[in-house]
């Protein structure tokens, strides 16, 4: 039986995939001026249905998402990396440091929550 946190992780993966379909991937920030998003930005985009022309309205933090972002700690799945981080920084780490696609991150989250 899936725990509540595992269910939230699967939901998070679903939002990453949905947000990833809305624009290109970016690195180093949640959003960029070209309409791109990182993995966490993709979640925010999918949950809040951000307008395509966001201009200066780029959110600088995520609120009211899922408790699993803070409460779940994971080991980095990238070969040779030994970091252990809470889920939110882990998503940023995989996106920015290992340049994983948002879809790869969502797939990993889904597999981890089974």
PLM region spans:
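Domain-length accessory/inserted modules outside core catalytic folds
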Residues: 1-37, 43-114
């Amino acid at each position: 039986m899936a725990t509540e946190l595992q269910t939230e992780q699967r939901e998070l993966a679903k939002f990453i995939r949905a947000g990833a379909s809305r624009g290109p991937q970016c690195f180093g920030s949640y959003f960029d001026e070209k309409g791109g998003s990182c993995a966490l930005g993709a979640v925010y985009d999918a949950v809040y249905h951000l307008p395509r022309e966001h201009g200066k309205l780029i959110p600088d933090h995520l609120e009211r998402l899922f408790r699993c972002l803070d409460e779940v700690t994971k080991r980095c799945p990238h070969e040779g990396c030994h970091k252990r981080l809470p889920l939110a920084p882990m998503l940023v780490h995989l996106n920015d440091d290992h340049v994983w696609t948002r879809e790869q991150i969502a797939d990993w989250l889904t597999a981890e929550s089974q």
